[in-house]
Structure formats: structure tokens, C-alpha cells
């Protein structure tokens, strides 16, 4: 995932097969963590109790502190998560599996 250009894509064996797609990442002070991470949890109908029960459909978590890909406006900065359009969030949710690598730069 390219935070500078706010783009993400899915790869298999080093080949891009979906994307790049528009994303929004964490706002200043709530930055999306860079580095190599791994998918550790998926929740289709997630709700954020930390942020006033905000809906987080198609959440794919890749850190141990609540950072995930999920559906939301990909032009509005987040509290650290990666916002995707609905169709992209659905695709990420369906394609990414527990243990898959997520590289953020």
C-alpha cells in the first residue's frame, strides 16, 4: 500500500491482479503504521465502539491495535485505518485471508 499516493492493490505471486484503487489512510497524528503486517482478523459487519459505534463494513485487520481495511470514504482521512470504496472493501474482504502479508510504505 502506497501512503504517499493513497493507492492500494492486491497481488498474487508478485503480480498485481486487482487495483490500484483509491484509499485514504490515517490523518497526521493518527498515521497508518508503515512496515510489513499480516491479516489477523476479518469482520464483515464491524462496529467501532471507540468511535461512537461507527460502522466499519468489511473490516480486514492487519495490526494488533485495531488498524484495518474497511469501507468508508476513500477521500476522508481516518484514525489510522484504510478507507476503501464499498466494491473495493468487499473484494479485499473476500480475497485476503488470515496470515496474508500487508506491506505499507
What residue ranges belong to the model's regions?
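Exported/periplasmic cell-wall-interacting domains
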Residues: 27-36, 40-105
